[in-house]
């Protein structure tokens, strides 16, 4: 087991947790398997100890452990009650709590019966379902955790970005590893696009065979434990076909950033002979496919993005898009090759915007489309993503939707053009890698 003092800090998440310390809401950390939730709990425990909280005030339960996985809500309550220190505030940490049936009863009882600060992780959105909210009367705060950003990837893998001076006096960013070996920034970014941001990759190194093994374990756990087994525990009968589930995963992974309808998924799988060795004639019902897609969204394997009509200021009932939580998982599923790199970098930008706290939608402006509208309570940005702006045709295509938007919010085109930092009639054009490193 890795001790907390050996864990890499992820300050953006840890600082959020610390900011909610000793407040009434239950702190709920959500995200796909193996994205770092358990490590974040350990870092929070270490923070408490470093700031004077005594070890006996801290109770940790990991429901992946054999010691706890067979417990029910009553068992959990008794376990905690026996360890309460009279007159002291207790800090309760529950990892992968969604495995326990009726866990909501125990959490609500702790809030009522004890002076405690509660932290929970879960790998399924069921943790924040309507049933859960009812039990806690809305008294919870969600920390949404994602795989590593590009900046975190550099840190976890021991890379450091430095500005170096060329013989002609110009400055450029280069990357150095722990052995002072030098790499071009684009080379390391390509490694990020290849292996993805699952923290465990840093433990096995940037070697394809080891990375594939780790990603296979994550994929299998999500499919088997977080979807198929959970459906059985809930007594649901909608998701019963592992083959159909895997085929839908492959379809969505292959179509990230493309407009997708639920009906088109089933029809494509049948038309291309991908179900029952091509023997199946009829497509699965839209209701069935929707249930499978919902399960993938609930497990944080895929994220759905809706369209927003900029002129009408409304969300029309039109097709959305899906993005995969980690580009390394996509490469594991579809093969390590240069496929559809335009949508792949879109995928990276989408999740970076989520990390930075934006609500993200696709922009519709007439018949044109803006890749992303990113909004917060007091900020809005329109963002286009493309591999290159060198071609005049591409420039016109990417700039036209932004030029047709009649407001004064920031408009940006991100591309992989090196050293790019220019403007087209007030529309900023930035290098994507520099943008990823900018915050």
Predicted regions: what is each one?
Residues 59-88:
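Short glycine-rich substrate-engagement loop in P-loop NTPases that contacts/grips substrate
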Residues 29:
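Hydrophobic anchor at the beta1->P-loop junction of P-loop NTPases
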Residues 131-254, 258:
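Interdomain motor-coupling "hinge/lid" segment immediately C-terminal to the ATP-binding subdomain
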Residues 208-379:
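Accessory nucleic acid-recognition modules appended to NTPase machines
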Residues 4-22:
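Pre-Walker A adenine-sensing motif
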Residues 37:
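Conserved lysine of the Walker
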Residues 117-123, 144:
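Structural recognition of the conserved hydrophobic beta-strand(s) that form the central parallel beta-sheet
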Residues 40, 44:
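Hydrophobic positions on the alpha1 helix immediately C-terminal to the Walker A/P-loop
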């Amino acid at each position: 087991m890795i001790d907390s003092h050996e864990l890499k800090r992820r300050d953006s998440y840890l600082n959020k947790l610390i900011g909610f310390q000793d407040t009434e809401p239950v702190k709920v950390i959500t995200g796909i398997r193996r994205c770092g939730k358990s490590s974040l709990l350990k870092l929070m425990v270490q923070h408490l100890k470093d700031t004077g909280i005594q070890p006996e005030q801290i109770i940790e339960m990991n429901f992946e452990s054999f010691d706890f996985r067979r417990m029910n809500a009553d068992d959990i309550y008794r376990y905690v009650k026996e360890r309460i220190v009279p007159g002291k505030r207790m800090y309760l940490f529950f990892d992968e709590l969604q495995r326990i049936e009726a866990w909501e009863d125990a959490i609500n009882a702790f809030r009522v019966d004890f002076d405690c600060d509660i932290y929970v992780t879960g790998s399924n959105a069921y943790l924040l379902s309507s049933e859960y909210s009812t039990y806690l009367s809305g008294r919870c705060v969600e920390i949404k955790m994602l795989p590593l950003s590009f900046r975190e990837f550099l840190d976890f893998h021991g890379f450091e970005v430095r500005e170096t001076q060329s013989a002609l006096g110009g400055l450029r960013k280069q990357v150095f590893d722990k052995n002072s070996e030098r790499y071009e920034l684009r080379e390391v970014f390509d490694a990020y696009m290849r292996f993805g941001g699952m923290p465990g990759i840093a433990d096995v190194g940037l070697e394809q065979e080891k990375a594939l093994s780790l990603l296979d374990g994550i994929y299998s756990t999500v499919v088997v434990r977080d979807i198929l087994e959970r459906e059985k525990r809930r007594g649901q009968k909608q998701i019963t076909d592992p083959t159909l589930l895997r085929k839908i995963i492959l379809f969505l992974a292959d179509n990230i950033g493309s407009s997708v309808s639920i009906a088109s998924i089933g029809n494509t799988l049948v038309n291309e002979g991908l179900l029952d060795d091509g023997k199946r004639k009829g497509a699965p019902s839209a209701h069935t496919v929707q249930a499978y897609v919902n399960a993938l969204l609930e497990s944080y394997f895929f994220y759905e993005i809706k369209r927003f009509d900029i002129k009408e200021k409304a969300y029309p009932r039109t097709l959305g898009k899906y993005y995969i939580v980690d580009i390394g998982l996509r490469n594991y599923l579809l093969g390590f090759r240069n496929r559809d790199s335009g949508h792949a970098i879109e995928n990276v930008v989408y999740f970076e915007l989520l990390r930075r706290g934006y609500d993200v939608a696709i922009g519709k402006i007439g018949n044109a489309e803006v890749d992303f509208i990113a909004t917060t309570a007091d900020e809005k940005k329109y963002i286009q993503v493309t591999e290159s702006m060198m071609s005049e045709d591409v420039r016109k295509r990417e700039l036209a939707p932004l030029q047709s938007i009649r407001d004064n919010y920031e408009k940006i085109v991100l591309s992989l053009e090196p050293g790019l930092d220019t403007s087209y009639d007030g529309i900023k054009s930035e290098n994507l890698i520099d943008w990823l490193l900018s915050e």
